[in-house]
Amino acid sequence: MKAPVDEMLVTDIAGRVAVVVTDMMTAADGLIRLGFARQSDRWERAIADDNDRQALVAALIDLDALFSTGRDWSPQALVEYYREIGVVRSGYRSVAWRGPAQYVIERHD
């Protein structure tokens, strides 16, 4: 799947490590401030517990990151769960793939 250009894409956040993919040089400072470290083709950050995960989700929403859709506990599914239980109260954006290079970005207010 080809990641959207000039976007921050959260590909994993339900496990013990959050993963963000981006080609935006301007995103580096924000990700470093959140504790992310650059790997070869992505940014990674350990997640201590669910409180840490909730704070990280809120911070990534503030950075206008895209949360990837998918099966099981996709980043978008986790944000929706946090909205249902009242942890996330703001809007966010998600991305769904329709093909290897086709995607749809949706705003959830």
Where are these regions (language model features)?
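Accessory DNA-engaging acidic/polar modules
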Residues: 1-109
